[in-house]
Amino acid sequence: MGQKVNPIGFRVGVIRDWDSKWYADKKIVPALVKEDAVIRKFLNKKYNNAAVSHVEIERLKELKVKKRVKITLHSGKPGVVIGREAATMKETIASLEKLTKKEIVFNVVEVRKPEVVATLVAQSMAEQLENRASFRKSTKNCYAKSIKVRAKGIKTLSQRLGGREMARTEGYSEGQVPLHTLRADVEYATAEAQTTYGILGIKVWIYHGEILPGQSHEELRKERQSSASSNHGGGKRRPSRKGPRRSQEDAATEGGN
């Protein structure tokens, strides 16, 4: 049943660390959890065109947990986040301090290989589907880029293809994506494509290899982002067995869209 479990939460504490790092008295934990959610929602909404992969929040002892919050935003377009002469970033810090009533320490980290980040791949597919590209075409483009930049496996799923009234799930995979192996470094993300005929749900899994004892997930992530591109061939692309077989009429209709 590994395919029914969120791959990120399944590996937290084993090979992955938390995106929120802080300790607090149990009386204020609910307020801080809510504050984290508000901060992430604000940043994702403000920088929805800046290719934000994830947001890390820290309230460590040396930061004086009640008064200071350290936020690290990982983005594929750091220039959009910072702005000219850091004007956009200063505006963001002021808005966050007003929102949280706390001092904000704001850092921006560049994502150098967005092709192997599941969140950004899902966002890219959603944008292509919103521009009326076919699911197969957008999937093929993302697969080619991800496998070229050292991804060892990728899998995608989507629903309500072609605007049909009855939802049907169709997926493809290339390479290997082990879901049951805890030491397997698997990224997972979801995205929604707002189309003229409704919302399409997209799921993406990307496999980067195994993390062995003594290795750190964060160190390997930085190494992947800074390493040179090399071509790692994947397996044969195959359709998911979950979806029903498509007729020639369905294929022609979707190809026309």
UniProtKB/Swiss-Prot annotation:
GO terms for molecular function: mRNA binding; rRNA binding; structural constituent of ribosome. It holds the Pfam family Ribosomal_S3_C. Residues 234-245 have a biased composition (Basic residues). Residues 217-257 are annotated as: Disordered. One of its GO terms (biological process) is translation. Keywords: Ribonucleoprotein, Ribosomal protein, RNA-binding, rRNA-binding. Residues 39-112 form the KH type-2 domain. CDD domains: KH-II_30S_S3. GO terms for cellular component: cytosolic small ribosomal subunit. Coiled coil: none annotated. Disulfide bonds: none annotated. Part of the 30S ribosomal subunit. Forms a tight complex with proteins S10 and S14. Binds the lower part of the 30S subunit head. Binds mRNA in the 70S ribosome, positioning it for translation. Belongs to the universal ribosomal protein uS3 family. PANTHER family: 30S/40S RIBOSOMAL PROTEIN S3, SMALL RIBOSOMAL SUBUNIT PROTEIN US3C. This is Small ribosomal subunit protein uS3. It comes from Haploplasma axanthum. The lineage of its organism: Bacteria, Bacillati, Mycoplasmatota, Mollicutes, Acholeplasmatales.
